Amino acid sequence: MYDNLKSLGITQPEEIDRYSLRQEANNDILKIYFRKDKGEFFAKSVKFKYPRQRKTILSDNDSQGMREISEISPNLRYVIEELDRLCLRDRQEEDLKRKILDDLRHLESVVANKIAEIEADLEKLTGK
């Protein structure tokens, strides 16, 4: 699992927090950020440079004939797919944690209201 990330030397992909991708001249620059340890001000990161793949294609405009384009490297595409899977899983886990905490807070409120209602009923019975 995560063979492409491991081929980059990333031995613990589960420690990845996020990534950024930008284009500089004829290269794509991938920067991977890892989770911060307690007491650290900055997250550790690694940077990779991928040359853009050049292709010559037939132009839509008949007068130009052929034209050259550049696109993302296939290897980088595979790495990004793995990063997206990792980051999406982390976001889903965070969303689930948030939902569970929200449900727990709601349950606390419902139970507190029910206890107050029962105590009020009990007070009515003992007050007579």
UniProtKB/Swiss-Prot annotation:
Coiled coil ranges: none
UniProt-listed HAMAP family: UPF0325
Pfam families: DUF3461
Secretion signal span: none
Protein name: UPF0325 protein NT01EI_0832
Assigned protein family: Belongs to the UPF0325 family.
High-level lineage: Bacteria, Pseudomonadati, Pseudomonadota, Gammaproteobacteria, Enterobacterales
InterPro entries, A to Z: UPF0325 (IPR020911)
Membrane-crossing segments per the record: none
